[in-house]
Amino acid sequence: MIKQITERFTPRQYLAEFLLGLTALFGLYLIVAWSSYTPLDNSWATVSAYGNTINKVGSFGAWIIDLFFVFLGYVAHIIPFTAFLVPIYLLKTKAVKQLSCTRIILR
């Protein structure tokens, strides 16, 4: 039984699952930053007279979300949810076994 379990998971698959988990956590961080975004924060493109950061995740969250909004426009609203939901989907469907570096680069 133990031999069957160890044959299924390789170190590369463990690393892939770990990185997907970190990506999902970063996506959750971006969702919180996106939901508490306000133009009154001191961020990448704006300077505010209000000294405190209103964003719930701090000045870095305000900065990164504002950077997304400036460079990507309305598409920036999709990025936090995609960064959270795609890794969760890949982990739930066990698609990690089929992932390879060349597939990720080509997609």
From Swiss-Prot:
A GO cellular component entry from the record: plasma membrane
Membrane topology, from the record = Multi-pass membrane protein
**Keyword Cell membrane (UniProt):** yes
- From the UniProt annotation, give the residues forming the signal peptide: none
Where is this chain's protein located in or outside the cell? Cell membrane
List all membrane-crossing ranges: 14-34, 68-88
InterPro entries recorded: FtsK_4TM
Give the main localization category.
Answer: membrane
Lineage top rank: taxon? Bacteria
Keyword Transmembrane helix (UniProt): yes
Q: Which UniProt keywords apply?
A: Cell membrane, Membrane, Transmembrane, Transmembrane helix
- Write the protein's name: Uncharacterized protein HI_1595
From which source organism is this entry? Haemophilus influenzae (strain ATCC 51907 / DSM 11121 / KW20 / Rd)
